[in-house]
């Protein structure tokens, strides 16, 4: 068990609050096959990054706007199996609403659709791909999130599940909790995660005065990916 003090929490969404793994894999695999690309490679690259970045990487000479719109439309339509990760709803409900934000690589429209489908509350403070010029792994999304909650990034804790997001949080100056929900633990550690836990069920709000005091359980359960 570890005790962490911070001023605010900045959550990634997919892989942290919402289990959209299968939907993401279906959409990006289909797109990869259509363009003669390796589906596994594309799916892995797409996690935690703005969809436009992945489109540009794999189709440098393609119609980026059209392909990105195609991806987003399919993602908004494919909600099968989409659920909240264990502990996500309880943790969000326990936190003061002005002390947490969602910082996601999704567009606002897609993020809102997925939050509704998963039964999670819409945050008071929302940073999406539409709000920044440079997405993760650049620090811009988390710098904007920290500014929006009213604290320096160094006083915030980022909760992430993939290397691109962890690097973004660290580059912004925040501490980062990595979740074992999407990639192997060594990838989280190599990206710079300060603590690694199974999922949001392993993060609890112990007290709230001027600062949030969190308790995190870094022990790995046998059934998790690591």
List each language-model region with its residue ranges:
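N-terminal helical cap/lid subdomain that shapes the substrate entry/recognition surface
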Residues: 2-99, 107-109, 120
